[in-house]
């Protein structure tokens, strides 16, 4: 290979590494944003671990995010519950942006993996 070809390969490798780092960074930002929304809007009922075992959660029968039944639901189903509300959970369509809803759904999914 010529020197030019080596430099092109190195440049391509650097670009790929930078692109991967940017994607990971965006994912981490979304996770941080989701955690912030969750702590502000969800922990009163669902608790820090998502089990719904808080006094308010028990009184309102908040769902345990890590239960097998809930884990089977799609992100779209969870998004609709956040947007429209369900049972005693209020709707958040006027309180959260689409990005915040997406971030909090991703954060909730991560709770069960910890």
Give, region by region, the residue ranges found by the protein language model.
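Post-cleavage N-terminal segment of exported redox proteins
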Residues: 1-31, 110-114
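Helix-centric, low-specificity signal for extended rod-like, repetitive segments
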Residues: 3, 32-34, 79, 102
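Electrostatic cytochrome c docking/interface patches
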Residues: 22-37, 53, 68
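Generic hydrophobic secondary-structure packing signal
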Residues: 26, 30, 46, 78-81
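Periplasmic/extracellular electron-transfer cofactor-ligation site
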Residues: 35-61, 84-88, 110-114
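Extracytoplasmic electron-transfer domains, predominantly the class I c-type cytochrome c fold
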Residues: 59-111
């Amino acid at each position: 290979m010529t020197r030019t070809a080596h430099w092109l390969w190195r440049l391509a490798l650097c670009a790929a590494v930078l692109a991967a780092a940017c994607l990971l960074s965006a994912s981490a930002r979304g996770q941080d944003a989701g955690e912030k929304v969750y702590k502000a809007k969800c922990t009163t009922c669902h608790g820090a671990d998502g089990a719904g075992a808080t006094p308010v959660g028990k009184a309102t029968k908040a769902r345990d995010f890590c239960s097998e039944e809930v884990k089977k639901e799609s992100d779209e189903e969870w998004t609709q519950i956040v947007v429209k509300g369900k049972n005693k959970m209020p709707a958040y369509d006027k309180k959260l942006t689409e990005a915040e809803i997406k971030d909090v759904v991703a954060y909730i999914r991560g709770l069960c993996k910890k």
